Amino acid sequence: MSKVSIVIPNYNGEKCLRECLASLKKQDYRDFDVIVVDNCSEDASLQVIEESEGELLLEVIPLDNNYGFAKAVNDGIKASGSEYVILLNNDAVAGRHMVGALVNRLEKEPDVFSAQAMMLQYNNRKLIDSAGDYFCVLGWGFARGRDEAASRYTGKCDIFSACAGAAIYRRKVFDEIGYFDENFFAYLEDVDIGYRAKIYGWRNVYEPEAKALHIGSAASGSRHNAFKVSLSARNSMLLMYKNFAPWQKVVNFVPVCAGILVKIAYFARKGLAGAYLKGIFSSFFKMK
């Protein structure tokens, strides 16, 4: 059994998946297997995966529909028997030392649930794509350091949560806190599980010695589109509803309302206010 399982959720990732898998073949740390969970892709993704089967210890889990990110990674995590699980986006390219650096961090710090790699922008490798996820009082989840110089983010630190695009998780903790919430489908499910881990007393950290390039928006399109805006709005509300203590819901009510108004104004300028409001209102039907 491998020390680490690398779970790659995939949906129509033919154009980027080949480079993702090629980067895993070059890792200096070798005690890992790869599990690709395919969300019923309509392109040649499965053919691309087959090309790597002889060079990687590789398993494919084909799903019969596009169930989204959360279910895909959950199925991959449950199929693994490893001590650690790395989640890697299909449009991410792992640096040669990524796997080893992430494993080393969790080995040294037993109170850590997740550790995120330094995610660099694929088309401008001097800029950060994500150096961890934060969640602010306005009810916004956002990527730490995005579009800033990578040279400013070379220090190890604790973060609110790890971006699941390139991060390692201590597998046993999922049995304690639960898996990724499949109601989220996609977006902010990594912030949600990081929040849950913190509630249970676990830490989430940033590991800059592990690096990955990230193309971004490979499955959904541009950074802002109706699909992403609506789902992100809905999931931000669900995240707070699930994880806030009663006193937090009271204290943060006004700041969260202010945050919603700011977002409405912002997305109105992009023609996406309707999508944002649709997401906010749809969240109420998911609250139990």
Named regions from a protein language model:
Residues 22-31:
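Short, acidic, metal-binding catalytic loop of nucleotide-sugar glycosyltransferases
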Residues 23, 38-47, 65:
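A conserved acidic beta->alpha catalytic loop
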Residues 63-80, 90, 101:
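Glycine-rich, basic loop-to-helix element that forms the pyrophosphate-binding segment
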Residues 85:
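Short aromatic/hydrophobic "clamp" motif used to bind/position activated sugar donors
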Residues 92-135:
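Conserved donor NDP-sugar-binding/catalytic core segment of glycosyltransferases
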Residues 127-128, 148-169, 192-193, 221:
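A recurrent flexible, glycine/aromatic-enriched loop bordering the glycosyltransferase active site
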Residues 160-213:
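A short, conserved alpha-helix in the catalytic core of glycosyltransferases
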Residues 204-288:
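Active-site-adjacent helix/loop segment of glycosyltransferases
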